[in-house]
Amino acid sequence: MRGLNKVMIIGSMCRDPEMRYTPSGKAVTSFAVETRRDWTGPDSERHEESEWFNVVAWGNLAEICKQHLVRGQQVYIEGRLQTRGWEDSEGKRHYRTEIVANEMVILGERRLHHDPQHLAHSAEGDGNNDSD
């Protein structure tokens, strides 16, 4: 039986994206997105909860994210969850779960500067949305 691994989030950029290139020359950009959830409790008191998601984009989408995304901007990200594992220099094992983006849409104005942008970009057909 085939599984499903799909994630869709709408939130605000926590920081400017960081781009690098793999030894084989593939662009990879990483950034974090904060989502917020509001609700009213049984006592009629308002509550707010935030979640922070690590996101990585590859290839052409990585370059587009680096060029157009900035801290404070609202963004839609679609992709899949991936957990990476590695061992540090002291032999300790570490894990990181992140969203591997295959689509990004800039939704509105930056909170830090009122400059509306409405851009949609997809990695489909790019062939560069996987790690080396």
Task: List PLM regions with ranges.
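Core FKBP-type peptidyl-prolyl cis-trans isomerase
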Residues: 9-49, 85, 95
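Conserved beta-strand residues within beta-sheet cores
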Residues: 10, 14-16, 52-54, 58, ...
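Conserved positions in beta-strands of structured domains
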Residues: 14, 20, 58, 82, ...
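OB-fold and OB-like beta-barrel modules that bind single-stranded nucleic acids
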Residues: 8-13, 33, 71-82, 101-104
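A beta-strand/beta-hairpin structural motif
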Residues: 41-67
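OB-fold/S1-family single-stranded nucleic acid-binding modules
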Residues: 88-106
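Acidic, gly/ser/pro-rich intrinsically disordered tails
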Residues: 1-4, 20-24, 41-46, 91-92, ...
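Beta-rich strand-turn-strand
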Residues: 58-94
